[in-house]
């Protein structure tokens, strides 16, 4: 039986649960449920604090876990990324009062409040900077106004919360984060894990691609195939119309409109883009 950790709340949890449902796994049901056994797939899901997930996986109590890259790194747990999931994107950065021109070098001897102390200590050590790291479990942005810290290090998505507190980021990004699946360091992916990962990957592919269908004169087929190469080449079928063919290929969702414009200029007709629910590539 496969044992997998899922964030118990927040945006990471919502997105993870949605992907699992699309991949054919049992849902959580009640929001306070701590674990769910999916009898059909012989998988048990454990809903844990995102910060704790890497620790459980590193200890071998769980096979895989979905968490944030920043959380896994900050835990110092012996885990490795198995797959990046493309949601929950954020950056971990230093911030200080916006009316002051801060540089990272100015952190020397200062107090830095954060919920990710290990990430900060590792970065400071790499830079050769001595500073006091103050661990807080939340509302880090208010710590400067309360006189607890001189600067902060926190997760930044839109920056709206920082601006409300009169803060601005400075220095390079410490950690570029997103949701990831982690496994124990040196973990050998067995068949059960492969099935799970393949399903999740299939959902991600479906989210990132569209299926494109169009008709085109065979004279322009070679040119159109360069525009829509697909994954292993497009599917080409003859039409009743003389010298015309129907073409089907997967295209990156973000590029779909540009690709359709190019095909139109080439003389393609009946260009249709449709959603892909599940994929195996």
UniProtKB/Swiss-Prot annotation:
It comes from the Bacteria. GO terms for cellular component: cytoplasm. Its EC number is 2.4.2.17. Pathway: Amino-acid biosynthesis; L-histidine biosynthesis; L-histidine from 5-phospho-alpha-D-ribose 1-diphosphate: step 1/9. Pfam families: HisG, HisG_C. One of its GO terms (biological process) is L-histidine biosynthetic process. Feedback inhibited by histidine. It is found in: Cytoplasm. Belongs to the ATP phosphoribosyltransferase family. Long subfamily. Catalyzes the condensation of ATP and 5-phosphoribose 1-diphosphate to form N'-(5'-phosphoribosyl)-ATP (PR-ATP). Has a crucial role in the pathway because the rate of histidine biosynthesis seems to be controlled primarily by regulation of HisG enzymatic activity. This is ATP phosphoribosyltransferase. It comes from Corynebacterium diphtheriae (strain ATCC 700971 / NCTC 13129 / Biotype gravis).
């Amino acid at each position: 039986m496969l044992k997998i950790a899922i964030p118990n709340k927040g945006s990471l949890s919502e997105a993870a649960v949605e992907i699992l449902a699309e991949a054919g796994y049992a849902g959580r049901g009640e929001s306070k449920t701590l674990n769910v056994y999916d009898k059909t797939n012989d998988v048990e899901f454990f809903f844990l604090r995102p910060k704790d997930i890497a620790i459980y996986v590193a200890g071998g109590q769980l096979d895989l876990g979905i968490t944030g890259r920043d959380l896994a790194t900050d835990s110092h747990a012996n885990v490795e990324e198995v797959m990046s999931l493309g949601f929950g994107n954020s950056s971990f950065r230093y911030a200080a009062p916006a009316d002051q021109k801060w540089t990272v070098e100015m952190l020397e001897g200062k107090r830095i409040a954060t919920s990710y102390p290990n990430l900060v200590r590792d970065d400071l050590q790499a830079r050769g900077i001595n500073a006091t790291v103050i661990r807080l479990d939340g509302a880090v942005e208010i710590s400067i106004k309360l006189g607890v810290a001189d600067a902060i290090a926190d997760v930044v998505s839109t920056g709206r919360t920082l601006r409300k507190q009169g803060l601005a980021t400075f220095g390079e990004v410490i950690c570029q984060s997103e949701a990831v699946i982690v496994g124990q360091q040196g973990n050998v992916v067995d068949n059960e894990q492969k099935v799970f990962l393949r399903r999740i990957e299939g959902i991600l592919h479906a989210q990132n691609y569209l299926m494109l269908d169009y008709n085109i004169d065979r004279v322009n087929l070679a040119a159109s195939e360069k525009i829509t190469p697909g994954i292993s080449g497009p599917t080409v079928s003859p039409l009743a119309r003389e010298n015309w063919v129907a073409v089907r290929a997967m295209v990156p969702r973000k590029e779909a409109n540009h690709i359709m414009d190019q095909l139109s200029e080439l003389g393609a007709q009946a260009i249709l883009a449709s959603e892909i629910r599940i994929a195996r590539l």
